[in-house]
């Protein structure tokens, strides 16, 4: 009965920590792979190609000082919070799934917004093929960050700030379109941009978390 209350890592006293980025794709792709990776640290080092990280760095550098309504007209006026306001890694307090099992959420958010008239937003930049419902592919990741900022915890060095309410979440998509010009060493590439908003759904989130912990608790 006690195993239903507090899951520890196999052969360890560490609390179960789930990263927002692993809540959507990995458990669906291969449950056994996810089990082995989380419980026994066995698995491939499947990092995305470095070029996508470069896209992200360039996009964030361009938008970091702009009003958030410049990202998309679907967002109200506000500003992107800077590194001095947010720790490099944010974590939740101890949470419980639908079966009372404890876990912590922890990760590094892409874009966190403070709106001028109150409330906060969590936006992720993705270089991808544009689709209207793209945010559905990342719904648990985005809600995980909403949970973290609504129920913040602390790392050994820094406390995660309370940001409440989270009023907007979504994916800002960048899709390479065409090259405008070039010279010997560079080219000017144009990208189409589209915003895919997401409504919060805590019920669905905790149902998914419960399924994930069921996988890990087999």
Show the residue positions of the predicted features.
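Short, conserved loop/turn and helix-capping segments at secondary-structure boundaries
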Residues: 57, 135-140
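Hydrophobic/aromatic-lined pockets within catalytic cores
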Residues: 40, 127-130, 150-154, 217
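Short helix/strand-bridging catalytic loops that position acidic/His residues to coordinate divalent metals
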Residues: 46, 126-134
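Metal-dependent nuclease catalytic regions and adjoining charged, substrate-binding loops involved
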Residues: 3-20, 152-218
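Active-site ExK catalytic segment of metal-dependent nucleases
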Residues: 108-110, 119-129, 141
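Metal-dependent nuclease catalytic cores that hydrolyze phosphodiester bonds in DNA/RNA
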Residues: 1-119
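An active-site-proximal "capping" alpha-helix that borders the catalytic cofactor pocket
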Residues: 139-151
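A generic fold-level signal
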Residues: 104-106, 137, 164
